[in-house]
């Protein structure tokens, strides 16, 4: 009885910790990937950002008025048409939901747990991930802007 109850609580704590670690790691991997691809674009190592050859807007280096929006749109295409490691991943806290969300996160709240939000602010790609509740606690989320 008591040992079983303690075991369930300990197991749930362990699985939540593993899910949080998964989100932290995945968020960091996506950040590194975006930084690498934008660097390749800006240094002439590739002709199109995220290899999205379907639009001249994605031609490297990004010489458009809103490079963040263009880079985000190319990334949306990349995730939508690719078989990358994180493209088909699910939110570990809500298995029926996709991991990556292309939307501004608005007011930070606990419904963001387990998602990787990708947005833009015209100059860069905004990345936001909540790995632990409460999400509004700065220690529980990653929020950054990647300038292409």
Q: Over which residues does each language-model region extend?
A:
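Amphipathic alpha-helical segments typified by the pilin-like N-terminal helix
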Residues: 1-29
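N-terminal alpha-helical signal peptides/signal-anchor transmembrane segments
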Residues: 26-45
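Periplasmic/extracellular, small/polar-rich flexible segments of pilin-like filament-forming proteins
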Residues: 39-148
């Amino acid at each position: 009885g008591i040992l079983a109850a303690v075991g369930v609580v300990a197991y749930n704590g362990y699985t939540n910790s593993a899910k949080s670690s998964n989100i932290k790691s995945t968020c960091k991997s996506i950040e590194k990937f975006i930084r690498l691809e934008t660097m390749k674009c800006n240094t002439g190592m590739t002709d199109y950002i995220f290899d999205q050859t379907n639009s001249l807007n994605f031609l490297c280096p990004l010489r458009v008025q809103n490079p963040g929006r263009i880079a985000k749109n190319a990334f949306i295409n990349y995730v939508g048409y690719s078989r990358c490691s994180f493209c088909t991943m699910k939110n570990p806290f809500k298995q029926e939901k996709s991991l990556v969300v292309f939307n501004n996160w608005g007011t930070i709240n606990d419904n963001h747990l387990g998602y990787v939000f990708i947005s833009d602010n015209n100059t860069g790609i905004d990345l936001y991930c909540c790995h632990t509740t409460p999400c509004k606690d700065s220690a529980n989320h990653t929020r950054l802007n990647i300038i292409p």
